[in-house]
Amino acid sequence: MNLIWIFPIAFCDAAEPWQLGFQDPATPMMQGIIDLHNDIFFFLIVILIFVLWMLVRALWHFHYKRNPIPERIVHGTTIEIIWTIFPSIILMFIAIPSFALLYSMDEVVDPAITIKAIGHQWYWTYEYSDYNSSDEQSLTFDSYMIPEDDLELGQLRLLEVDNRVVVPAKTHLRMIITSADVLHSWAVPSLGVKCDAVPGRLNQTSIFIKREGVYYGQCSELCGTNHGFMPIVVEAVSLDDYVSWVSNKLD
């Protein structure tokens, strides 16, 4: 039996109260986003310290009591060159890794599984188009949020659903995302995924989950009254457990 179902709170990646940082990365893409954030944060700290130092130095050395007669400066070629070149260099160091990460998000891979997510007001429909039942119908199900009164021990309020998206870990997945009514957004922070669901349009994104677990997300596009009540739950399991789950769903 799958231990994730026995101890649902032990293996989960979900938002926590007063959380300021990122959730633990479960995909190479999310790991890249966190690494890029840390690199940019380093530059921000250096710039902040430098600006504060210049500000304090100016307030100290150029106080009106120390310089009752201010010096008139109308042009400074050297300082203009410095404050043009240095920011350009910093922006270059930030842009190179960010562009590399951006292009890697659009990298096309040969997926083992394709899943279509359709946003509705206010639930999700999932279609596993690679599998057909005996009547030639693809594996399709709706995913609704579990009301607070129906939650079991260990389940998370406003985040748990009646039907999870079950996928195999360490497998290339392709998500095709669209909407049946208004704009939605399929977002799971631990997976580094946020893809808009647009009516009449198919958006796609690739996912490679490195470890087994349960990953929680929510619709991230204002879509009406119950926008905050259409969570997303992705459960990554072993390949054997995934095959068993698909077989049970098709029976």
Swiss-Prot record:
Tell me a GO biological process for this protein.
electron transport chain
Q: Where does the UniProt annotation locate this protein?
A: Mitochondrion inner membrane
What domain of life is recorded for the organism? Answer: Eukaryota
**Which stretches face the Mitochondrial intermembrane side?**
1-39, 105-251
Name the residues that span the membrane: 40-60, 76-104
**Entry function:** Component of the cytochrome c oxidase, the last enzyme in the mitochondrial electron transport chain which drives oxidative phosphorylation. The respiratory chain contains 3 multisubunit complexes succinate dehydrogenase (complex II, CII), ubiquinol-cytochrome c oxidoreductase (cytochrome b-c1 complex, complex III, CIII) and cytochrome c oxidase (complex IV, CIV), that cooperate to transfer electrons derived from NADH and succinate to molecular oxygen, creating an electrochemical gradient over the inner membrane that drives transmembrane transport and the ATP synthase.
- Family the entry assigns: Belongs to the cytochrome c oxidase subunit 2 family.
Name of the molecule in the record: Cytochrome c oxidase subunit 2
> Which organism encodes this protein?
Marchantia polymorpha
Which gene underlies this protein?
COX2
